[in-house]
Structure formats: structure tokens, C-alpha cells
Swiss-Prot record:
Entry function: Reversibly transfers an adenylyl group from ATP to 4'-phosphopantetheine, yielding dephospho-CoA (dPCoA) and pyrophosphate.
UniProt-recorded name of the protein: Phosphopantetheine adenylyltransferase
Positions bound to substrate: S8, K40, T72, R86
Catalyzed reactions: (R)-4'-phosphopantetheine + ATP + H(+) = 3'-dephospho-CoA + diphosphate
EC supergroup of this enzyme: transferase
Length: 163
């Protein structure tokens, strides 16, 4: 099976990585689809995020990393995905994701959405939390892959040089 895992991944977290690794084991192939959303101001460009994900997943066979804009269902159809994969950290995630899953199903009735719960050790992680911790000089080494930590530290150290 081929799963599409869409998201902004700004930045990729260890929670994302855990989901990707588990999904490869379950489904065989995972297309990580990096959303290009011009209305948001990401910390990293789409190309930088793609490179971060490719570097972090290079030990996994069956992972493809792409960018997309527009509807997730169109991306899933274009890339021959059998399902859309979504991670859940809390009940509030489920309520939002279920609404999106129903919308996607109304647009492509043969496309399933599969929800995977995050592992407990990653349940607090979000890209926003990681950026906030990095912005104020906190340790993010346990939150993101090493190459992403380097990129974030470089980004925020250059944005806020010490006096």
C-alpha cells in the first residue's frame, strides 16, 4: 500500500519521524507531501523542508518526499496513494481531522484516511512548540532530528544574535 502523509513539516519533528517510520512498516510506501502554502510565513522554504525530510529519512526505504499545493485529495490521486495518513496527538486533533477526512471522502470516495496516534513520548510535540523553544534558546535536540536542530539553531541564532 502507498500512504500519503501531508503536512507543512515546518519543521520536521521526532513525532513526524516516528509516524513515518511506523507507516513504512505498516504500508510499505509513504509519500511525505510538504504543503506549499503562500499565505503562511514558514521558518524554512519548501525546498529546505524537503531536504530536511530526505536527510532524516535516508535510512528508510519506501519514502518519497514531494511538495504540493492545493487539495490533498488531488495530490493523493496524482501520486497514486491508497490512503491519507494523519497523526493524532489529542482528542482535539481527532475532531479536526475527522472533519477533513469526511471532506476528502466527499471529493474522492475511494480514498481512505487512516489515523495513527502518536507515541506518548512525542504527544507534546508540535512544530510551533519546537520553533518557540528554539527561538528562546531552549534545547530542541530531543524534539527534532539532528540536522533539523542545526538548521533551527542557525536560523534563530542569526535572527537573534547574542549581545
Amino acid at each position: 500500500m502507498r500512504a500519503l502523509y501531508p503536512g507543512s513539516f515546518d519543521p520536521l519533528t521526532n513525532g513526524h519521524m516516528d509516524l513515518i517510520e511506523r507507516a513504512v512498516s505498516l504500508f510499505g510506501e509513504v509519500v511525505v507531501a510538504v504543503l506549499s502554502n503562500p499565505s503562511k510565513r514558514p521558518a524554512f522554504s519548501v525546498d529546505e523542508r524537503i531536504e530536511q525530510i530526505r536527510t532524516a529519512t535516508c535510512h528508510l526505504s519506501g519514502v518519497e518526499v514531494i511538495s504540493f499545493d492545493g487539495l490533498t485529495v488531488n495530490c493523493a490521486v496524482t501520486h497514486r496513494a491508497d490512503l491519507i495518513l494523519r497523526g493524532l496527538r489529542a482528542m482535539s486533533d481527532f475532531e479536526y481531522e475527522l472533519q477533513i477526512a469526511h471532506t476528502n471522502r466527499s471529493l474522492a470516495d475511494d480514498l481512505e484516511t487512516v489515523f495513527m496516534a502518536t507515541t506518548a513520548r512525542h504527544s507534546f510535540l508540535s512544530s510551533s512548540v519546537v520553533k518557540e523553544v528554539a527561538r528562546f534558546g531552549g534545547s530542541i535536540d530531543h524534539m527534532v532530528p539532528p540536522e533539523v536542530a542545526k538548521d533551527l539553531n542557525r536560523l534563530f541564532n542569526s535572527a537573534f544574535p547574542s549581545s
